[in-house]
């Protein structure tokens, strides 16, 4: 059994400045570096640390990291972050998805976000489920270092349903933390050798490649927006700019759009759009794939060509220094799009 008292002796402590504990008492998931009075011990990036008020009251435990967000809180109740903790937290996340109808066996959706960072009280962690394959991305050093425990917990809670756990953190984990950022499988069921598979979302089929695709392979967080497009697409000519693998395009076709044009500068993405149109069984004459710069295409089209337009550009700002320019670019893009909708 784990010697908890011994573990507490060696765990680093974060002591907050006077009156800086209020946000934690309201269950805010972060401790900012400016709130810290003292660090007792010498924690490495990703270590679990305990957080105390200036009066010595235990407040939380979480992952330590150098930067403006010094601690990402894992628990407000205990500083024991062990295998049982990971199993309990991931089980709770799955129970929420079952309760909301996302994780129902035999339904018309078999892909969903299992863990959405702070929303599931697991800051720094994303896990997406693709019909038996869990793809995880760590956005903090602590979550990256805990990836084996996380994978083991997923094996326990999903059992035979789990085909694989794939870690795709090389583009999301903090590179300054000196981590070994190589993507790869943390678990594979015997006989499973695929890097892609067809999944269902609201009855629509999509081919997802988690090793080569953006993010975890598919933008699951856009599900409700895709359903929104479905409401308006019938009998309309639709343009999907920055289409990636064509999620919005497939929903528009399924809703009865007259014609859909999908535009993206990535040839790989456009090949997947064509594949998704094919596996969806749609008439190919109703869809055109255009491997072009979306902004250039938008400039050249007549103002009455489309009745419905989806504009979902990539992030223009990766850091605060370019935020103002990015906001201006979004404004120009949206204004141009609005001017071209009939």
Features from the language model and the residues they span:
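Non-catalytic accessory regions of SAM-dependent methyltransferases
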Residues: 7-131
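A short, charged
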Residues: 84, 88, 92-102, 106-108, ...
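Short hydrophobic-aromatic micro-motifs
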Residues: 51, 60, 134-137, 199, ...
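Non-catalytic substrate-recognition/targeting regions of SAM-dependent transferases
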Residues: 115-122, 126-128, 144-218, 227
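A short, sequence-level motif marking secondary-structure junctions
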Residues: 63-68, 141, 211-214
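Rossmann-like S-adenosyl-L-methionine
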Residues: 191-342
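A short interface-forming secondary-structure element
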Residues: 131-143
């Amino acid at each position: 059994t784990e010697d908890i008292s011994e573990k507490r002796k060696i765990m680093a402590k974060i002591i907050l400045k006077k009156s800086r504990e209020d946000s934690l008492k309201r269950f805010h998931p972060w401790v900012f570096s400016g709130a810290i009075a003292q660090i007792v011990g010498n924690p490495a990036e990703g270590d679990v640390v305990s957080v105390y008020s200036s009066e010595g009251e235990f407040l939380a435990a979480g992952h330590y990291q150098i930067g403006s967000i010094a601690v990402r809180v894992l628990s407000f109740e205990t500083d024991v972050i062990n295998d049982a903790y990971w199993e309990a937290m991931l089980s709770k996340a799955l129970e929420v998805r079952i309760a909301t109808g996302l994780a129902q066996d035999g339904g018309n959706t078999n892909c969903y976000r299992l863990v959405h960072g702070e929303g599931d009280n697991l800051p720094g962690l994303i896990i997406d489920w693709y019909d038996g394959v869990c793809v995880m991305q760590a956005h903090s050093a602590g979550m990256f270092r805990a990836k084996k425990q996380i994978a083991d917990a997923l094996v326990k809670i999903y059992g035979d349903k789990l085909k694989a756990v794939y870690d795709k953190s090389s583009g999301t984990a903090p590179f300054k933390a000196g981590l070994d950022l190589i993507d790869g499988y943390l678990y594979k069921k015997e006989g499973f050798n695929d890097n892609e598979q067809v999944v269902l979302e609201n009855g629509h089929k999509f081919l997802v490649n988690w090793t080569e695709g953006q993010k975890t392979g598919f933008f699951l967080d856009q599900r409700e927006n895709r359903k929104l497009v479905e409401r308006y697409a019938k009998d309309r000519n639709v343009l999907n700019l920055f289409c990636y693998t064509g999620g919005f395009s497939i929903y528009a076709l399924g809703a009865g759009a007259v014609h859909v044009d999908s535009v993206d500068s990535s040839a790989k993405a456009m090949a997947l759009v064509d594949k998704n149109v094919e596996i969806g069984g749609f008439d190919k004459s109703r869809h055109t794939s255009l491997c072009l710069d979306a902004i250039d295409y938008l400039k050249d089209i007549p103002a009455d060509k489309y009745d419905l337009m989806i504009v979902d550009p990539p992030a223009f700002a990766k850091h605060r220094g370019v935020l103002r320019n990015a906001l201006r670019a979004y404004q120009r893009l949206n204004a141009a799009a609005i001017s071209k909708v009939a």
